[in-house]
Each structure stands twice: as structure tokens, then as C-alpha cells.
Amino acid sequence: MARITVEDCLKHIPNRFELALAATYRARQLVQGHTPKVEAKDKPTVVALREIASGQVGIEMLKKVPT
């Protein structure tokens, strides 16, 4: 299992606060049943960070209203 670091995610979302919000919103989506865009062996928060680090999810998460 490869480790995910904040630095990997900050390459795609440079603001730490926006990164935390985007990861939170995406993790909530995953819990609600949305399909993960990367391999989903881990908890939803880790999967969300992996998606951000791979560039498949980004700042656009902040423009969506969480439900």
C-alpha cells in the first residue's frame, strides 16, 4: 500500500483549508454511495485524498453543495 501525503494533494489544491474541505465533501459522497475513481480498499477519507492526489478530483468539489 502506497502512502498518501499532504504534499501530493497540495500539488492539485494548493490551499490546505480548501484541500480539507474538498476531501471532506468527496468522502461524504463516497459514504453516500458514489463510485470511487481509484481503488477503494481504504476508508472514504483516504480514498478521497488518493483521488485528489491523482488529479481525478479537485477544487471543483467546493463548487458542489454537499448533501
Swiss-Prot record:
This is DNA-directed RNA polymerase subunit omega. One of its GO terms (biological process) is DNA-templated transcription. GO terms for molecular function: DNA binding; DNA-directed RNA polymerase activity. InterPro entries: DNA-dir_RNA_pol_omega, Pol_omega/Rpo6/RPB6, RPB6/omega-like_sf. The keyword Transcription applies. It comes from Cupriavidus necator (strain ATCC 17699 / DSM 428 / KCTC 22496 / NCIMB 10442 / H16 / Stanier 337) (Ralstonia eutropha). Its EC number is 2.7.7.6. Pfam families: RNA_pol_Rpb6. The lineage of its organism: Bacteria, Pseudomonadati, Pseudomonadota, Betaproteobacteria, Burkholderiales. PANTHER family: DNA-DIRECTED RNA POLYMERASE SUBUNIT OMEGA. Promotes RNA polymerase assembly. Latches the N- and C-terminal regions of the beta' subunit thereby facilitating its interaction with the beta and alpha subunits. One of its GO terms (cellular component) is DNA-directed RNA polymerase complex. It catalyses: RNA(n) + a ribonucleoside 5'-triphosphate = RNA(n+1) + diphosphate. It is an enzyme of class 2 (transferase).
